[in-house]
């Protein structure tokens, strides 16, 4: 009797988590129960009833939207999550010799992609792993092992606002949709400066984040000019949200509609 070999697959997760969908769906159910009770047992109070009914419709729409967005991000859908990550990867201008740092590595997806692209490099992934996304150091290490790059990757728990590395430690520094999530730093530009601190002179950087979301980055062009004046002359901004592979349904401000890439050489 032949034995079947079970091939392990890496688990990188989805930017629209099942936990988020469950929470929104639970709120929808809660409003539905309240709405039914109001219409059945409470005479009058029409404005309140209409308000709750609208909340039922809103949360139902949100649940459906997030399910659809999760599908679009997934490999089974339009694979948008991978394509956004690959766009960052394509902007890395590096010969692959030395060390690279991935700030906010999550499940290790970008760290591992870099390790697979640059066979002579060692890649360090850092993340705070507070549990909000379901990622962990263990998952990163397991994904790295499955992908065959565990000997050239390592993962460290660290705060992006206080990286545990000396100045000029890395030949390349990247970050993918992380800075806006860092709670320990209100000023997101400080995170860019901290990332550049550990980059060697002449090293390349690629940072992808919600750079067009003004609540996080109110004066982006001004900060780019400050970086240029500080000596980082080679710096470019790319509007990821205009990419043709991103469906219109995802081009909302809280999804992929405000994503951009800052990249260049220190």
Tell me what each language-model feature is.
Residues 244-266:
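Core SAM-dependent methyltransferase catalytic element
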Residues 202-209:
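Conserved beta-strand signature within the Rossmann-like core of class I S-adenosyl-L-methionine
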Residues 148-160:
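Conserved SAM-binding strand-loop segment of SAM-dependent methyltransferases
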Residues 107-119:
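Conserved SAM-binding loop of SAM-dependent methyltransferases across substrates and taxa
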């Amino acid at each position: 009797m032949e034995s079947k070999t079970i091939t392990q697959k890496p688990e990188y997760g989805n930017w629209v988590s099942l936990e988020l969908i469950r929470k929104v769906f639970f709120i929808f159910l809660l409003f539905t129960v309240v709405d039914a009770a109001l219409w059945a047992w409470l005479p009058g109070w029409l404005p309140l009833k209409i308000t709750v009914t609208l909340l039922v419709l809103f949360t139902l729409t949100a649940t459906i939207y997030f399910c659809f967005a999760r599908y679009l991000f997934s490999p089974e859908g339009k694979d948008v999550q991978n394509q956004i990550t690959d766009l960052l990867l394509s902007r890395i201008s590096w010969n692959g010799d030395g060390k690279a740092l991935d700030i906010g590595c999550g499940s290790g997806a970008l760290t591992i992609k870099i390790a697979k692209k640059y066979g002579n490099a060692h890649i360090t992934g850092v993340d705070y792993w507070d549990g909000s996304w379901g990622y962990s150091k263990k998952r990163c290490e397991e994904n790295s092992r499955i992908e065959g790059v565990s000997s050239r990757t390592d993962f460290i728990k660290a705060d992006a606002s206080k990286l545990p590395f000396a100045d000029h430690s890395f030949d390349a520094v990247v970050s993918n949709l992380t800075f806006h999530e860092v709670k320990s730093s209100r000023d997101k530009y400080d995170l860019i400066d901290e990332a550049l601190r550990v980059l060697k002179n002449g090293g390349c950087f690629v940072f992808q984040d919600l750079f067009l979301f003004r609540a996080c980055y109110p004066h982006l062009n001004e900060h780019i000019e400050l970086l240029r004046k500080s000596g980082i002359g080679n710096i470019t901004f790319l509007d990821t949200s205009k990419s043709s592979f991103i469906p219109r349904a995802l081009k909302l401000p809280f999804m992929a509609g405000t994503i951009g890439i800052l990249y260049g050489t220190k």
